[in-house]
Structures are given as structure tokens and as C-alpha cells.
Design a protein with these regions (language model features):
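Histidine-centered metal-chelating micro-motifs
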Residues: 26-28, 46, 63, 67-76
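Short, low-complexity, Pro/Ser/Thr/Gly-rich segments in the mature regions of secreted, periplasmic
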Residues: 94-102
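A short glycine-rich, His/Asp/Glu-containing loop-to-beta-strand
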Residues: 1-28, 88
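Ligand-binding loop in jelly-roll beta-barrel domains
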Residues: 54, 68-95
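Glycine- and acidic-residue-biased ligand/ion/polar-headgroup-sensing regions
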Residues: 33-52, 61
Length: 102
């Protein structure tokens, strides 16, 4: 096996976010320009992309946020516990990891 540090790609960057949702909070419908890869630190969430079933992801589980599909549902279903997760995106330097849908 070989391992090398990836070379920097001009115009692109990788960002890591720690995101927190209070109990019962939900996100607005949005779109990801590039895929994201994440891991739930605490709590759980329910999520659905256009045309796909609702999934539930719990603490200790990983997930992928799909690019180019409307992310129609994202919520912390717990009335008592916060949700904390980390997610990484590799994006063009000028992009944000999501944009709200009208």
C-alpha cells in the first residue's frame, strides 16, 4: 500500500463543518453542488432527497449528501436531544456547500 498527501487543486478546497441542530429543528429545502461525506457525533436525523425514501441516521453512523438532487427533508426528530454531526465537502473555492431552494 502507498499513501500520499493529495496535491492541492487550484480553485478547489476541502471544508469540514461541525453542524448542530437543537431538538426538533429542521432545515429548509436546499441543494448541494458537490457531494458531502459526514458522521453523526450525537443524536440522530431524518433526511430525504427528491424521489427517495426518508432515512434515519444515528450517532456513530456515516452518511453521504448527494449532489444535484433537491434535499427536501432534514430534521432532528428528537424533542429532547440535540443533533451534532461533522460533514466534509470538496468545493470550488467560490462555492458554498448548499443553496436554498425557492
Amino acid at each position: 500500500m502507498t499513501r500520499r498527501r493529495a496535491e492541492r487543486q487550484p480553485g478547489w478546497e476541502t471544508r469540514l463543518y461541525l453542524i448542530e441542530y437543537p431538538p426538533g429543528a429542521k432545515g429548509a429545502p436546499h441543494l448541494h453542488p458537490e457531494p458531502g461525506v459526514g458522521w453523526v457525533v450525537e443524536g440522530e436525523f431524518e433526511s430525504a432527497f427528491a424521489g427517495q425514501p426518508v432515512i434515519k441516521v444515528k450517532a456513530g453512523q456515516s452518511f453521504v449528501e448527494q449532489a444535484g438532487l433537491a434535499h427536501l427533508l432534514f430534521r432532528n426528530p428528537s424533542p429532547d436531544h440535540p443533533l451534532r454531526f461533522v460533514v466534509a465537502y470538496t468545493l470550488r473555492s467560490v462555492d458554498e456547500p448548499f443553496r436554498l431552494l425557492p
